[in-house]
């Protein structure tokens, strides 16, 4: 079996990972451009951990400016087998108040203008996104949250907007009426790219606000979000520590095939593939491309 390496991408308010030991900082070059930050590579209770700050220290990158392809590519190059996204979000449900964590199991993509695939002209691939989140990772996260006494909803639909502006009231009411659970700006195309890279992926959506639909709460603003982020960051650190303590040391095969997503995805014939694109795909798709 393959050794498990847990990747963690920290969103707003999570620029470091408390509890990470034997840390070394490493910058890995990517053919897809510059990733958000250097990787902080270490361990928690003996489990190899690779941490990245999605917005970088000081929050210098907006959601639309993040190079999602480079981020996932360097995670793959660092040997990550399982990837956890810790992300701030707004809530559309009374039962998911600020401070609640949500184990997302579905996504709706409302972004535009972001590169959403490693593949394209010269090497076309179509991976399944029917079930975008690893059920195995969600189970491990749920058990860790329960052990730490962290309020956690075990399912929910995350709608990803482009940003950087927050929702209009009409948008917020539309998403609420459609039954979505939370809203954020970063988990897509991240989840899609993780699937293309055959990395098992799961999101912990950390609720900071009620967006702007709630009649008894003010419209979302950065000042209020930051206050909740501080409390959420402490819980996220405890969650990561407990998850690492109980996480299998050998990578478990994904029950939905996330780690074999490219087995039947690439449709371009070998002789029609663009050599330059194939070269860029060496980390992401080398397992299947090197065989022809």
PLM region spans:
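Acidic, Ser/Thr-rich low-complexity intrinsically disordered segments
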Residues: 260-292
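Zn-dependent metallopeptidase/amidohydrolase metal-coordination segment
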Residues: 185-223
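His/Asp/Glu-rich mid-to-C-terminal helical/loop segments that flank catalytic regions of hydrolases
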Residues: 212-260
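Generic non-transmembrane alpha-helical segments
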Residues: 136, 140-151, 238-246
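Active-site/ligand-binding-proximal alpha/beta "capping" segment
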Residues: 144-181, 267
């Amino acid at each position: 079996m393959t050794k498990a390496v847990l990747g963690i991408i920290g969103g707003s308010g999570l620029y470091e990972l408390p509890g990470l030991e034997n840390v070394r900082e490493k910058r890995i070059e990517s053919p897809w451009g510059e990733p958000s930050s250097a990787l902080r590579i270490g361990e928690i209770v003996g489990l190899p951990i690779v941490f990245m700050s999605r917005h970088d220290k000081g929050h210098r990158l907006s959601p639309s400016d993040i190079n999602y392809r480079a981020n996932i590519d360097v995670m793959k190059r660092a040997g990550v087998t399982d990837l956890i996204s810790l992300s701030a979000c707004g809530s559309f449900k009374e039962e998911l108040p600020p401070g609640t964590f949500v184990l997302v199991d579905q996504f709706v993509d409302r972004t535009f203008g972001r590169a959403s695939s490693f593949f394209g002209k010269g090497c076309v691939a179509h991976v399944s996104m029917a079930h975008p989140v690893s059920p195995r990772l969600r189970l491990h996260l749920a058990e860790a949250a329960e052990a730490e006494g962290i309020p956690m909803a075990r399912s929910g639909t995350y709608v990803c907007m482009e940003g950087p502006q927050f929702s209009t009231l009409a948008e917020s009411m539309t998403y609420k009426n459609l039954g979505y659970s939370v809203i954020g700006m970063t988990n897509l195309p991240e989840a899609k790219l993780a699937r293309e890279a055959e990395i098992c992926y799961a999101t912990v959506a950390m609720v900071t606000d009620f967006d702007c639909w709630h009649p008894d709460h003010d419209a979302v603003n950065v000042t209020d979000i930051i206050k909740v982020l501080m409390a959420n960051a402490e819980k996220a650190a405890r969650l990561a520590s407990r998850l690492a303590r109980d996480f299998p040391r050998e990578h478990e095969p994904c029950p939905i095939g996330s780690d074999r997503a490219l087995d039947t995805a690439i449709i371009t014939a070998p002789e029609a593939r663009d050599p330059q694109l194939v070269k860029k795909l060496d980390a992401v798709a080398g397992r299947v491309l090197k065989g022809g």
